[in-house]
Amino acid sequence: MASKPSIPKGTRDFSPAEVSKRQYIIQTIKANFEKFGFQPIETPSFENSDTLMGKYGEEGDRLIFKILNSGNFFYNKSKIELPESIEELQLNSAEKITLEQRIELNKFTGKISEKALRYDLTVPFARYVVQHQSEIEFPFKRYQIQPVWRADNPQKGRFREFFQCDADVVGSKSLWQEVELVQLYDTVFTSLGLEGVTIKINNRKILSGIAEVIGASDKLIDFTVALDKLDKIGEDGVKKEMIEKGISEDALVKVQPLFNFSGTFADKIAQLSDLLSSSEEGMKGVEELKFICDNVADLGLSTAVLDLDVTLARGLNYYTGAIFEVAAPKTVAMGSIGGGGRYDDLTGIFGLKNMSGVGISFGLDRIYLVLEELQLFPETVAATSKAIFLNFGDKEALYASKAIQKLRQENIKVELYPDNVKVGKQFQYADKRLIPFAVLVGDQEINSNSYALKNLVTGEQVSVDFEGLKKTLLG
């Protein structure tokens, strides 16, 4: 007996009902992207490896899915010296291999894989901007809704294949872009009925300033990567990792105020100003934060809350200014449902210097889980038809099909049961599909140019003409 088929760990199949709910979220996000003036683009699902590698830090690079070279690459083994075993590759214990072995491993990896699945949409977007710069009008506001892949450890709300919904602006250093992106977050989540989200904000310059004043400027990346894990491993875990990365005990004493910041936004700004008074870079970050938050406060938000979180680091190498992360309402145990930030020279890695950008992303899969848990999907979001015409034979099916054709022209979702089988089986099918209405057609209906319309929820059945049928199904 053949084994039961399955899907790879960290991936999912979606039922018609699930797809309808996902499309509801996507269409809501897309409509608001366009309302704010963003234009759509798409990029390939895989990129050249050198486009992606080295852009996400050491931890991010480890999570990139590599694609083996295709075709008859391995048939001609004389061209490549294959390792004899997995142990020889040392893939799962890279820290144990020597520099020489690492160099050989990198050479081998380069021979068997030159492409990789995209890790996010931001780096491919930077590549797109550089490649198509002569065709683009700057500032360029783009949105992109496509899947990405990460070789992560699957858990609740974390998958190896998932969609990102990104909006970015490149070609402008204006902080009004950040103000608008905060408003965009608020508008989208309000449209989805998800009230009480917290938009956390920080600034990479503030983190650089903190590293400077505690004497750990040379450990900035290690410092931010560890700090970004505060919600996962707690204060003690963060301090332990910092020490392991070579950050001194004295530096940890100086950084202690970070873990105790509290009060209003103004209070936090005052505490930051005291801590960073000797850092020009840090104070610049404070001023940028103040500009964004003051203007957002003047404009107002509908349902979201903007909060200054000085421990927010987002362990990605390319952020240079504002950093965003969106937390679900406190009633739901879920990680971030969005994030982003300012990147002043991301396109510089591809040769286009001084092209500042800022962008945000919506986590479709986690937003889905939150809406499902809070029962916020509208009842109108359904993959099913509004009505099914029962089949009593070819003559009746033809009469029904003429009505179906006209109803579909009115954008009403209807269908004909394909087979002339027992009526009980047809009703059972409609019930399992959660179709709310059934239309019955016999000689009496054909002769009187009418339709028997049955409400499958209440059991009520009435005779209607076509206009009455259309009005009910449109309601």
From Swiss-Prot:
One cellular-component annotation, GO:
cytoplasm
State one molecular function term (GO): ATP binding
What UniProt keywords are attached to this protein's entry?
Aminoacyl-tRNA synthetase, ATP-binding, Cytoplasm, Ligase, Nucleotide-binding, Protein biosynthesis
Q: Any idea where this protein resides?
A: Cytoplasm
| Gene3D superfamilies referenced in this protein's UniProt entry, alphabetically | Anticodon-binding domain (3.40.50.800), Bira Bifunctional Protein, Domain 2 (3.30.930.10)
Tell me the disulfide pairings in this chain: none
Q: Where is this chain primarily localised?
A: cytoplasm
Q: Thylakoid: present as a keyword of the record? A: no
Question: GO annotations under biological process?
Answer: histidyl-tRNA aminoacylation
Question: Known InterPro entries for this protein?
Answer: aa-tRNA-synth_II (IPR006195), aa-tRNA-synth_II/BPL/LPL (IPR045864), Anticodon-bd (IPR004154), Anticodon-bd_dom_sf (IPR036621), His-tRNA-ligase (IPR015807), HisRS-like_core (IPR041715), HisRS/HisZ (IPR004516), HisRS_anticodon (IPR033656)
Entry keyword Transferase: no
Question: According to the UniProt record, what class of enzyme is this?
Answer: ligase
Q: What is its EC number?
A: 6.1.1.21
Q: Entry's PROSITE patterns? A: AA_TRNA_LIGASE_II (PS50862)
Q: Which reaction does it catalyse?
A: tRNA(His) + L-histidine + ATP = L-histidyl-tRNA(His) + AMP + diphosphate + H(+)
Q: Which PANTHER family match?
A: HISTIDINE--TRNA LIGASE (PTHR11476:SF7), HISTIDYL-TRNA SYNTHETASE (PTHR11476)
**What binding partners and quaternary form does the record give?**
Homodimer.
What family name appears in the similarity comment? Belongs to the class-II aminoacyl-tRNA synthetase family.
Give the protein name, as stated in the record: Histidine--tRNA ligase
Question: Which species expresses this protein natively?
Answer: Flavobacterium johnsoniae (strain ATCC 17061 / DSM 2064 / JCM 8514 / BCRC 14874 / CCUG 350202 / NBRC 14942 / NCIMB 11054 / UW101) (Cytophaga johnsonae)
State the taxonomy lineage.
Bacteria, Pseudomonadati, Bacteroidota, Flavobacteriia, Flavobacteriales
Query: In the UniProt record, what gene is named as encoding this protein?
Result: hisS
